[in-house]
């Protein structure tokens, strides 16, 4: 259906876009037809429509329905496309949904290369985030892909960058910000909605949010897995300090949402301890990386 157009001009599309979706854990069933569609879109001489995949009820939270419903590893299949041919957005706050999606849709409408949009959302009924407390107070910040929740406090030693992705993971990082500040921990906290959107931002903005040097001084807190971090090119020690749903390389069990999040180590206490360890070890982390580089020039 999305391959059909009523336009006689091959450069213009006059047809419909389509959407299909299910639990994030089951969306791999849709991967093969979506991949074939992406290949067709790439090679078509005519403008075509855009396929939407809704990976709903994604993340560890859905284990409340049973182990079969975990949307942790499964949604990683949506990274298996040539870069630039899909836009994947992972949303955690209600106010991120509209700007994040419409930014992706605007790009897809203008760029014939983009044939698929993947929308990943979780189920929990979290309170709407108070953006007056964020460093980036823009209500449409999600359109930029990555945005700053907390910036470094000027005049104090910096302890690194924390990149968040997913619902419970980001909500619980926000919950411990005041506690981190009371403990003297000065980290920059970034919400990662979509690396695909972030890649399309001006270089000045990208450098202001996540400069290249920050990649080797970062950890991430994600409701996904350690195999697929929120952004690429992170440093060699990032995995050692990051928190993900597969932190112990085991399939998780199931239970109440609170129990599931605690087992995944994405509860506020686990997040606070991990960020504190990351901050406390900063000098040691940087020294270890310096020693690795030094071995290359000996």
Residue ranges of predicted features:
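A glycine-rich helix N-cap at a beta->alpha junction
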Residues: 38-57
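Long mid-to-C-terminal assembly/interaction modules of large eukaryotic proteins
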Residues: 30-32, 65-66
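Conserved phosphate/anionic-ligand binding catalytic regions in large, soluble enzymes, centered on
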Residues: 1-7
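Intrinsic-disorder/low-complexity recognition with aromatic hotspots
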Residues: 27-28, 37
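Patatin-like phospholipase A catalytic core
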Residues: 11-13, 29-30, 214, 247-248
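A short, small-residue-rich loop immediately preceding and capping a beta-strand
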Residues: 10-26, 51-54
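Phosphate-handling active-site elements
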Residues: 8-15, 43-45, 183
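Thiamine diphosphate
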Residues: 55-75, 83-88, 96-100, 105-298
């Amino acid at each position: 259906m999305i391959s059909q157009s009523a336009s006689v001009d091959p450069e213009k599309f006059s047809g419909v876009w389509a959407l299909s979706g299910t639990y994030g854990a089951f969306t791999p069933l849709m991967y093969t037809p979506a991949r074939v569609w992406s290949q067709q879109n790439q090679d078509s001489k005519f403008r075509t429509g855009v396929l939407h995949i809704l990976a709903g009820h994604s993340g560890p939270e859905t284990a409340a329905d049973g182990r079969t419903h975990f949307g942790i590893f499964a949604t990683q299949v949506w990274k298996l496309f040539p870069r630039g041919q899909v836009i994947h957005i992972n949303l955690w706050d209600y106010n991120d949904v509209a700007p994040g999606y419409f930014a992706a849709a605007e790009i897809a409408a203008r760029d014939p290369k983009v044939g698929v949009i993947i929308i990943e959302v979780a189920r929990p009924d979290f309170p709407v985030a108070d953006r007056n407390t964020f460093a980036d107070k823009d209500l449409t910040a999600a359109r930029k892909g990555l945005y700053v929740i907390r910036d470094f406090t000027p005049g104090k030693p910096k302890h690194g960058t924390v990149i968040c992705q997913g619902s419970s993971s980001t909500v619980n990082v926000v919950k411990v910000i005041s506690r981190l500040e009371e403990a003297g921990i000065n980290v920059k906290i970034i919400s990662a909605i979509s690396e695909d959107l972030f890649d399309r931002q001006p270089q000045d903005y990208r450098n202001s949010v996540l400069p290249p040097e920050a990649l080797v001084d970062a950890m991430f807190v994600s409701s996904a897995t350690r195999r697929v971090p929120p952004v690429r090119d992170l440093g060699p020690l990032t995995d050692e300090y990051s928190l993900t749903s597969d932190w112990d390389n085991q399939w998780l069990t199931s239970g109440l949402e609170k129990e599931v999040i605690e087992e995944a180590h994405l509860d506020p206490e686990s997040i606070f301890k991990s960020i504190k360890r990351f901050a406390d070890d900063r000098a040691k982390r940087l020294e270890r990386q310096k020693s690795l580089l030094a071995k290359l020039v000996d």
